[in-house]
Amino acid sequence: MRTYAPAATETVLRRLLEEPSLAHAVTHHAVLPAREAITAPFPAWLDRRIVRGLEDRGITSLYSHQAEAVEAVHAGEDIVVVTPTASGKTLCYALPVLQALAEDPSARALFLFPTKALGQDQVAEFAGLARASSLDVAAATYDGDTPAPIRSAIRTAGQVVVTNPDMLHSAILPHHTKWFQLFEQVQVIVIDELHTYRGVFGSHVANVLRRVLRLCAHYGSSPIIVCSSATIGNPAELAAQLTGRAPRLIDRNGAPAGARHVLLVDPPLLDQATGARGSALTHAERWALPFLRAGRQTIVFGRARVAVEIILTRLREALREHLGPRSRIRGYRGGYLPTERRAIERGLRDGEILGVVSTNALELGVDIGALDVSILAGYPGSIAATWQQLGRAGRRQETSVGVLIASGSPVDQYVIHHPEFLLEGSPEEARIDPNNLHVLLAHLRCATFERPFEPGEVFGPGPVDDLLAFIGEEGHVRQSGDGRWYWSSENFPASEVSLRTAAPENVVIIDTTPDRPRVIGETDLFSAQVLVHTQAIYLHDSQQYHVDKLDWGERKAYVRKVDVDYYTYANRAVTLKPLDVFASEPATGGRRVHGEVMVASLVTLFKKLKFGTDENVGWGPIDLPELELQTTAYWLTYDEADGTAIPADRGVDRSGGSARVLRRTLAEPPPGRPALDRPDGSGSPPNKWRKDDLDVALLGAGRAIQAVAAVLLMVDPRDLGLVTQVRSPHSEAPTIYLYEAVPGGIGLSERLFKRHEELITGARALIQACPCDAGCPACTGPRLDPEVNGKSLALRLLAALDSRDARGAKHQATRAESVPA
């Protein structure tokens, strides 16, 4: 076995940047300077046992944000702490809770973490601090893995209960009478990783917390709420929406940090005509190997289990001669046994494991010690997640390196060519809508089961008597003579509500791989048609499953574990009809609108696409009924397509992959048609469009707008459906719709309406920055006709919608009028 002498991280980076093939792919290289610690003494009121416990661990003072947080909680304030990874947020809530227990052993605390693994890690950290402080504290996790005998002990004697929102919703709140010690004595509720509670999940969790606080009030307690979050654009607003409180924002970080190199890498274009790029996985391997050979602890993040396994296999093979035991390079993902995960985490902390390849399972705050390099094979989907993953390196006051390698997706390409999104603060905001009618009704049923509602009682936005009367018509609740509302059904409402979906009816996903089938998840009906149709490849906790059968009538999908090199994409034909307009304003080249829409969806066939290349390796039919989704949407109309005799159409779904394009009405271009191959989309009279060209332009521009919207709102692109209509029956103009893929919507479309100009300029910049010739999957989507320049057509349309161009044209016209004849 060959060995290499350890080299400094910066030395290895310098060598890498001297390699032309790697250096040329770097689109941006920033160095974030080292930061000195800002400290404060321990509060005078902090119990001496806790102070000694901290000092025994080498902690002789607090960082400034820790001191501010513990003082605020001690004064009875709700807080939200927003500081980077490895800045010591745990002490912000651990110290106030330990102090409360030191003063009153009958006190209780409830810790909420988004995942079981994180909860188990944090309870171990908290228990260790309690032992160091010579405090006998009963802290335990209460999750799906907790044995029944231990559950009973936690209910009666647990001083610190660590759980997740799903268990709180389904196993604690419905049985609150068994938890009366917790609800009577709870002094602090901790909500960690606040930024993960967004979208539908966050909307559900907000209602779970409404139920928690309702029961606390019933039992006579009024706990302080402590939230912690990664950097997002609206942490105080999100915390307020989740908790119904107005927390104090603590975001001045006092923790030290070493210098950090941040590199954005765009694999080179392999085919300018098709837009095919080098693999992000291959480039992740090329960047990781030199650091590993130099003895630098490195983590590589892949976006899916298959990506993790590919990178892991390649690294082990390449390093076999140099490192010997394969155990020094490990994988980490959902599906590993808890004991195996703990061993990997311990090996990383101790330095026995040199490299790890992980899904986002290691993104959250599980303690893995101090790493030197973090490499991301693909944009994780949000800026918050990006910094969480990059922050896995640099936990000591030493120089670290973070590398983000883009895939060919439009979102990745937008981020990689706009470094300001990562380096100049977060533009993205986590959005939830706790008052979404579907979500609110679901939790109102659960809350009524937990205890009766008084006449005029408020739950969320206001009194809920009318909503309870509606539920009463279903036969689930009844009103007594004194006006109180009681649960009257034999159903157990919490078991019928998934925190991960908003639809009132779901498809249960059953894993038939083991001897005893087990439920591994569920999904709403609208998503089920594309995620778990028969023969689909379904991903759960980074594990691939083949859907053997979707029983639509029984609402059950039967799956089994597989390991394949392809994924499935379902073509969804969508028709859309506006129902109501909430807001409508003039915009450059047309109008921007926010309103309610009815979306009808019909899934007809699926494709098998190879990972990495998206090569089509097969297809099959899908036989499922049409579904309707009533939701909210943002749309924009283009009102300058004069002289284009276009019949009204109902549109088709454009939400990703290959989409069905409207039937062409003109097979050949008319004589003398001007070329449309200039990069700026010029070359044709500004207001003259052929129907086919306009269809392509709307589709290309819409895909780019959808990608930019996902970046700005910090959502998965699949959360927003795309429909384009060459002539909308509603507006009688060419229209691009972005609708929320959630019944009733959760507020995303309203935000898009307000950020209309950013969407247009961002989409235009995304397409202009792409080096392809005529459109590709990284900007306007796959080229469906090699003879049509979709890139120039989309740019021509976006230029007509861009207020900057309108202002420039107006300025030029004014100048022309002022020139003497």
How should these model regions be labeled?
Residues 4-26, 541-550, 554-556:
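Structured, non-catalytic alpha/beta "coupling" segments that mediate domain-domain communication
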Residues 17-57, 61, 68, 74-75, ...:
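Helicase motor core with emphasis on the C-terminal RecA-like subdomain
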Residues 60, 102-106, 287, 764, ...:
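ASCE P-loop NTPase motor cores of helicases and related translocases
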Residues 92-93:
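Hydrophobic positions on the alpha1 helix immediately C-terminal to the Walker A/P-loop
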Residues 770, 775-779:
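Short cysteine clusters
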Residues 800-811, 821:
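Short Fe-S-cluster ligation motifs
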